[in-house]
Protein backbone atom coordinates (compact mmCIF):
# COMPACT_ATOMS: atom_id res chain seq x y z
CA UNK A 1 0.00 0.00 0.00
CA UNK A 2 1.23 3.50 -0.83
CA UNK A 3 -0.29 6.70 0.57
CA UNK A 4 1.05 10.09 1.56
CA UNK A 5 1.52 8.87 5.13
CA UNK A 6 3.89 6.03 4.14
CA UNK A 7 7.36 7.41 4.86
CA UNK A 8 11.03 6.52 5.19
CA UNK A 9 12.20 2.92 5.00
CA UNK A 10 8.71 1.53 4.45
CA UNK A 11 8.17 3.84 1.47
CA UNK A 12 11.55 2.94 -0.02
CA UNK A 13 10.73 -0.77 0.25
CA UNK A 14 7.49 -0.22 -1.67
CA UNK A 15 9.24 1.81 -4.40
CA UNK A 16 11.97 -0.81 -4.78
CA UNK A 17 9.44 -3.63 -4.96
CA UNK A 18 7.51 -1.87 -7.71
CA UNK A 19 10.65 -1.16 -9.72
CA UNK A 20 11.98 -4.75 -9.59
CA UNK A 21 8.56 -6.38 -10.03
CA UNK A 22 8.50 -8.19 -6.68
CA UNK A 23 5.27 -6.36 -5.78
CA UNK A 24 2.40 -7.64 -7.91
CA UNK A 25 -0.50 -5.50 -6.66
CA UNK A 26 -0.31 -1.93 -5.35
CA UNK A 27 -3.21 -0.21 -3.59
CA UNK A 28 -2.80 3.51 -3.03
CA UNK A 29 -3.97 7.09 -3.26
CA UNK A 30 -2.80 10.01 -5.43
CA UNK A 31 0.67 9.20 -4.04
CA UNK A 32 1.00 6.58 -6.80
CA UNK A 33 1.19 9.36 -9.40
CA UNK A 34 4.39 10.88 -7.97
CA UNK A 35 7.42 10.84 -10.29
CA UNK A 36 9.54 8.53 -8.13
CA UNK A 37 6.92 5.75 -8.33
CA UNK A 38 8.05 3.48 -11.19
CA UNK A 39 6.63 0.11 -12.25
CA UNK A 40 8.59 -2.67 -13.90
CA UNK A 41 5.50 -3.45 -15.98
CA UNK A 42 2.12 -1.90 -15.22
CA UNK A 43 -0.45 -4.23 -16.76
CA UNK A 44 -3.72 -3.00 -15.25
CA UNK A 45 -4.65 0.32 -13.64
CA UNK A 46 -7.92 0.54 -11.71
CA UNK A 47 -9.12 3.98 -10.64
CA UNK A 48 -12.01 4.16 -8.19
CA UNK A 49 -13.92 7.42 -7.71
CA UNK A 50 -12.66 8.57 -11.11
CA UNK A 51 -14.11 12.06 -10.72
CA UNK A 52 -11.52 12.74 -7.99
CA UNK A 53 -8.68 12.60 -10.53
CA UNK A 54 -7.83 15.11 -13.23
CA UNK A 55 -7.04 14.19 -16.83
CA UNK A 56 -3.33 14.97 -16.38
CA UNK A 57 -3.18 12.87 -13.20
CA UNK A 58 -4.68 9.85 -14.94
CA UNK A 59 -2.33 10.34 -17.91
CA UNK A 60 0.65 10.39 -15.52
CA UNK A 61 -0.38 6.96 -14.27
CA UNK A 62 -0.70 5.52 -17.78
CA UNK A 63 2.79 6.88 -18.60
CA UNK A 64 4.42 4.77 -15.88
CA UNK A 65 4.68 1.81 -18.24
CA UNK A 66 6.43 1.44 -21.60
CA UNK A 67 3.38 -0.37 -22.93
CA UNK A 68 -0.03 1.19 -22.19
CA UNK A 69 -1.79 -0.66 -19.36
CA UNK A 70 -5.35 -1.93 -19.44
CA UNK A 71 -7.54 0.65 -17.71
CA UNK A 72 -10.67 0.30 -15.57
CA UNK A 73 -12.24 3.46 -14.17
CA UNK A 74 -15.15 3.37 -11.72
CA UNK A 75 -17.51 6.10 -10.60
CA UNK A 76 -21.06 6.55 -9.34
CA UNK A 77 -21.49 9.72 -11.43
CA UNK A 78 -19.39 9.98 -14.62
CA UNK A 79 -18.08 13.51 -15.13
CA UNK A 80 -19.20 15.25 -18.37
CA UNK A 81 -15.97 14.52 -20.28
CA UNK A 82 -16.10 10.81 -19.39
CA UNK A 83 -19.75 10.52 -20.40
CA UNK A 84 -18.95 12.21 -23.72
CA UNK A 85 -16.09 9.74 -24.30
CA UNK A 86 -18.49 6.82 -23.84
CA UNK A 87 -20.84 8.40 -26.39
CA UNK A 88 -18.06 8.76 -28.96
CA UNK A 89 -16.85 5.20 -28.53
CA UNK A 90 -13.56 5.79 -26.70
CA UNK A 91 -14.65 3.82 -23.63
CA UNK A 92 -16.50 0.55 -23.19
CA UNK A 93 -19.14 0.80 -20.47
CA UNK A 94 -20.46 -1.64 -17.89
CA UNK A 95 -23.35 -0.48 -15.72
CA UNK A 96 -24.43 -1.73 -12.29
CA UNK A 97 -27.89 -0.23 -11.96
CA UNK A 98 -29.28 -2.18 -8.99
CA UNK A 99 -28.97 -1.61 -5.27
CA UNK A 100 -27.50 -4.40 -3.12
CA UNK A 101 -30.21 -6.71 -1.72
CA UNK A 102 -32.16 -5.23 1.19
CA UNK A 103 -31.35 -1.59 0.52
CA UNK A 104 -33.95 1.11 -0.18
CA UNK A 105 -33.50 4.15 -2.43
CA UNK A 106 -32.54 7.28 -0.49
CA UNK A 107 -35.36 9.84 -0.29
CA UNK A 108 -33.99 13.29 -1.18
CA UNK A 109 -35.73 16.46 0.04
CA UNK A 110 -35.11 20.17 -0.53
CA UNK A 111 -35.50 22.54 2.42
CA UNK A 112 -34.89 26.26 2.79
CA UNK A 113 -32.89 28.01 5.50
CA UNK A 114 -36.04 29.06 7.35
CA UNK A 115 -37.13 25.43 7.77
CA UNK A 116 -34.27 24.41 10.07
CA UNK A 117 -36.54 23.90 13.10
CA UNK A 118 -38.43 21.08 11.37
CA UNK A 119 -35.12 19.67 10.12
CA UNK A 120 -33.69 19.58 13.64
CA UNK A 121 -36.88 17.87 14.85
CA UNK A 122 -36.44 15.20 12.18
CA UNK A 123 -32.80 14.68 13.18
CA UNK A 124 -33.84 14.30 16.82
CA UNK A 125 -36.42 11.68 15.87
CA UNK A 126 -33.93 9.68 13.80
CA UNK A 127 -31.27 9.69 16.53
CA UNK A 128 -33.83 8.75 19.18
CA UNK A 129 -34.69 5.74 17.00
CA UNK A 130 -31.03 4.70 17.12
CA UNK A 131 -29.88 6.11 13.79
CA UNK A 132 -26.91 8.40 13.04
CA UNK A 133 -26.65 11.64 11.05
CA UNK A 134 -24.15 13.46 8.81
CA UNK A 135 -24.24 17.26 8.57
CA UNK A 136 -22.01 18.68 5.81
CA UNK A 137 -20.74 22.27 5.60
CA UNK A 138 -19.17 23.89 2.51
CA UNK A 139 -16.48 25.75 4.52
CA UNK A 140 -14.29 25.00 7.53
CA UNK A 141 -14.01 28.56 8.82
CA UNK A 142 -15.75 31.86 8.15
CA UNK A 143 -14.88 33.48 4.83
CA UNK A 144 -15.70 37.17 4.48
CA UNK A 145 -15.86 36.85 0.70
CA UNK A 146 -18.56 34.16 0.80
CA UNK A 147 -21.77 34.31 2.78
CA UNK A 148 -21.83 30.60 3.59
CA UNK A 149 -22.22 28.49 6.69
CA UNK A 150 -18.92 27.24 8.14
CA UNK A 151 -18.11 24.12 10.10
CA UNK A 152 -16.38 25.62 13.14
CA UNK A 153 -19.25 27.95 14.05
CA UNK A 154 -21.81 25.38 12.96
CA UNK A 155 -20.34 22.67 15.18
CA UNK A 156 -20.58 24.88 18.27
CA UNK A 157 -24.15 25.82 17.38
CA UNK A 158 -25.15 22.19 16.81
CA UNK A 159 -23.67 21.20 20.17
CA UNK A 160 -26.02 23.74 21.76
CA UNK A 161 -29.02 22.59 19.69
CA UNK A 162 -28.43 18.90 20.46
CA UNK A 163 -27.04 18.82 24.04
CA UNK A 164 -28.56 15.36 24.53
CA UNK A 165 -26.44 13.84 21.73
CA UNK A 166 -22.72 13.33 21.17
CA UNK A 167 -21.14 14.97 18.12
CA UNK A 168 -17.92 14.44 16.14
CA UNK A 169 -16.34 16.73 13.56
CA UNK A 170 -13.91 16.07 10.70
CA UNK A 171 -12.36 18.31 8.05
CA UNK A 172 -9.32 18.44 5.80
CA UNK A 173 -7.21 20.67 8.05
CA UNK A 174 -7.19 18.20 10.94
CA UNK A 175 -4.16 16.01 11.57
CA UNK A 176 -4.69 12.49 10.18
CA UNK A 177 -4.68 10.79 13.59
CA UNK A 178 -7.12 13.33 15.00
CA UNK A 179 -9.42 12.88 12.02
CA UNK A 180 -9.23 9.09 12.29
CA UNK A 181 -10.09 9.25 15.99
CA UNK A 182 -13.17 11.40 15.34
CA UNK A 183 -14.29 9.13 12.50
CA UNK A 184 -13.80 6.06 14.67
CA UNK A 185 -16.16 7.51 17.28
CA UNK A 186 -18.88 7.84 14.66
CA UNK A 187 -18.22 4.47 13.01
CA UNK A 188 -18.43 2.67 16.36
CA UNK A 189 -21.57 4.55 17.42
CA UNK A 190 -19.97 6.53 20.25
CA UNK A 191 -21.20 9.74 18.59
CA UNK A 192 -24.56 10.15 16.89
CA UNK A 193 -23.93 13.19 14.67
CA UNK A 194 -20.90 13.74 12.43
CA UNK A 195 -20.29 17.36 11.40
CA UNK A 196 -18.00 17.40 8.37
CA UNK A 197 -16.84 18.92 5.11
CA UNK A 198 -16.62 16.95 1.87
CA UNK A 199 -13.76 14.82 3.26
CA UNK A 200 -16.46 12.21 3.91
CA UNK A 201 -17.45 12.16 0.24
CA UNK A 202 -15.75 8.80 -0.37
CA UNK A 203 -14.56 5.85 1.67
CA UNK A 204 -17.02 6.13 4.57
CA UNK A 205 -19.33 3.19 5.30
CA UNK A 206 -21.66 3.46 8.30
CA UNK A 207 -24.80 1.35 7.64
CA UNK A 208 -26.50 2.81 10.73
CA UNK A 209 -26.35 6.38 9.34
CA UNK A 210 -29.75 7.29 7.87
CA UNK A 211 -29.64 11.07 7.35
CA UNK A 212 -27.34 13.22 5.21
CA UNK A 213 -27.86 16.98 5.62
CA UNK A 214 -26.01 19.17 3.09
CA UNK A 215 -25.99 22.85 4.01
CA UNK A 216 -25.63 25.51 1.30
CA UNK A 217 -26.24 22.71 -1.19
CA UNK A 218 -26.18 25.24 -4.04
CA UNK A 219 -22.38 25.36 -3.63
CA UNK A 220 -21.93 21.71 -4.60
CA UNK A 221 -21.93 20.10 -8.04
CA UNK A 222 -24.13 17.16 -8.99
CA UNK A 223 -21.33 14.61 -8.64
CA UNK A 224 -20.47 15.81 -5.15
CA UNK A 225 -24.09 15.88 -4.05
CA UNK A 226 -24.64 12.34 -5.34
CA UNK A 227 -21.44 11.09 -3.71
CA UNK A 228 -22.38 12.65 -0.38
CA UNK A 229 -25.85 11.15 -0.61
CA UNK A 230 -24.19 7.78 -1.11
CA UNK A 231 -22.91 7.86 2.48
CA UNK A 232 -26.44 6.96 3.63
CA UNK A 233 -28.78 4.23 2.46
CA UNK A 234 -26.21 1.54 3.28
CA UNK A 235 -28.46 -0.33 5.70
CA UNK A 236 -31.97 -1.79 5.53
CA UNK A 237 -33.71 1.29 7.02
CA UNK A 238 -35.16 4.16 4.97
CA UNK A 239 -32.56 6.91 4.60
CA UNK A 240 -32.86 10.59 3.77
CA UNK A 241 -30.74 13.26 2.09
CA UNK A 242 -31.72 16.85 2.91
CA UNK A 243 -30.48 19.62 0.59
CA UNK A 244 -30.63 22.98 2.39
CA UNK A 245 -30.42 26.25 0.44
CA UNK A 246 -31.51 29.86 0.55
CA UNK A 247 -34.40 31.12 -1.57
CA UNK A 248 -32.31 32.97 -4.15
CA UNK A 249 -31.19 30.27 -6.57
CA UNK A 250 -30.01 30.45 -10.17
CA UNK A 251 -31.86 28.47 -12.84
CA UNK A 252 -28.98 25.98 -13.12
CA UNK A 253 -28.96 25.49 -9.35
CA UNK A 254 -32.70 24.82 -9.34
CA UNK A 255 -32.18 22.21 -12.05
CA UNK A 256 -29.41 20.54 -10.02
CA UNK A 257 -31.58 20.41 -6.90
CA UNK A 258 -34.57 19.11 -8.88
CA UNK A 259 -32.62 16.28 -10.53
CA UNK A 260 -31.22 15.23 -7.15
CA UNK A 261 -34.72 15.09 -5.69
CA UNK A 262 -36.09 13.23 -8.73
CA UNK A 263 -33.62 10.35 -9.04
CA UNK A 264 -30.94 8.21 -7.40
CA UNK A 265 -29.70 7.04 -10.80
CA UNK A 266 -26.08 8.11 -11.26
CA UNK A 267 -26.32 7.98 -15.06
CA UNK A 268 -29.38 10.23 -15.17
CA UNK A 269 -27.52 12.65 -12.91
CA UNK A 270 -24.44 12.44 -15.14
CA UNK A 271 -26.53 13.14 -18.24
CA UNK A 272 -28.06 16.20 -16.54
CA UNK A 273 -24.55 17.34 -15.56
CA UNK A 274 -23.41 16.96 -19.18
CA UNK A 275 -26.33 19.09 -20.41
CA UNK A 276 -25.74 21.77 -17.77
CA UNK A 277 -21.94 22.02 -17.98
CA UNK A 278 -20.94 20.75 -21.41
CA UNK A 279 -18.63 17.84 -22.34
CA UNK A 280 -15.25 19.49 -21.79
CA UNK A 281 -12.34 18.90 -24.17
CA UNK A 282 -11.92 15.31 -25.37
CA UNK A 283 -8.43 16.11 -26.70
CA UNK A 284 -7.32 18.17 -23.71
CA UNK A 285 -7.65 18.30 -19.93
CA UNK A 286 -10.86 20.29 -19.52
CA UNK A 287 -13.39 17.91 -17.90
CA UNK A 288 -16.51 20.05 -18.34
CA UNK A 289 -17.63 23.18 -20.19
CA UNK A 290 -17.47 23.96 -23.89
CA UNK A 291 -14.17 23.57 -25.72
CA UNK A 292 -13.47 25.88 -28.65
CA UNK A 293 -10.71 25.85 -31.26
CA UNK A 294 -9.68 29.43 -32.09
Task: Label the predicted regions.
Residues 1-258, 268:
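Inter-lobe coupling/hinge segments of SF2-like helicase ATPases
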Residues 236, 240, 248-294:
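C-terminal accessory region of SF2 helicases/translocases
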Amino acid sequence: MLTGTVKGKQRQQVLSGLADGSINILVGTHAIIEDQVLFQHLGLAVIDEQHRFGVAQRAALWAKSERPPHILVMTATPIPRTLAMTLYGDLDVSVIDELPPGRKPVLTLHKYDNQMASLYAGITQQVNEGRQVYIVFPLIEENKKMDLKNLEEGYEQLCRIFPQFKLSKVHGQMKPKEKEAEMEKFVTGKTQILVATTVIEVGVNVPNASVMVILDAQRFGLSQLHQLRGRVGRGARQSYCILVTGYQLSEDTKKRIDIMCDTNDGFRIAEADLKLRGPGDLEGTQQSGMAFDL
